[in-house]
């Protein structure tokens, strides 16, 4: 499994990161930061799906190899951030804040930050400044995708064969409809949950 360098995709990444930076820099009257996160999700989904489908069609797909490469790519930066954040948090946070930080650290380590912050109401209530690992929610969504989607594609390619596209399309349509319904009744769920983000 390998990626061919795509300058066009790097350009999309640059475009996507700009609204995220502007939003977190608290630029006045700027409200479009969340769009950048969606673009990153689309890029990741496109790249991973392309590579997985190529490997499956060539008969050289390996779950262990896929997971190993994801781990080698993501874990060094992830745990560097977690270690540095924990050192700083232990120095500047109050005990009550450290308790909440410990819970978010645990969820970040096990890749369920999105659900941790979803039940904590995330961006929609407490100030983000008191949640230094809040940004880990998007990585958790990606990791859940990396864990589950290869298994689905492998099984679908064996049992559905030429209908993988139809089966995947049905799942994505269900995800889209789900996100549309809950955005009005449970906005935090629509924002953080993986089923609502899958499409």
Explain the meaning of each model-derived region.
Residues 1-199:
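Membrane-interface helix/loop caps of multi-pass membrane proteins
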């Amino acid at each position: 499994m390998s990626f061919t360098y795509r300058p066009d995709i790097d350009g999309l990444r640059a475009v996507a990161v700009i609204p995220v930076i502007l939003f977190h820099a608290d630029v006045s009257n700027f409200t479009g930061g969340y769009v950048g996160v969606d673009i990153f999700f689309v890029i990741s989904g496109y790249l991973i799906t392309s590579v997985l489908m190529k490997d499956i069609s060539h008969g050289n797909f390996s779950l262990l190899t896929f997971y190993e490469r994801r781990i080698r790519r993501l874990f060094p930066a992830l745990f560097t951030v977690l270690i540095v954040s924990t050192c700083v948090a232990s120095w500047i946070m109050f005990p009550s804040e450290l308790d909440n930080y410990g819970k978010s650290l645990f969820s970040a380590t096990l890749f369920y930050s999105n659900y941790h912050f979803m039940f904590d109401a995330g961006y929609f209530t407490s100030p983000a400044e008191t949640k230094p690992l809040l940004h880990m929610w998007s990585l958790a969504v990606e990791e859940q995708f990396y864990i589950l989607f290869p298994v689905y594609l492998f099984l679908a390619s064996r049992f559905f064969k030429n209908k993988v596209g139809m089966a995947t399309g049905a799942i994505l349509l269900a995800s889209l409809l789900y996100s549309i319904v809950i955005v009005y009744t449970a906005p935090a769920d629509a924002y953080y949950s993986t089923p609502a983000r899958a499409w």
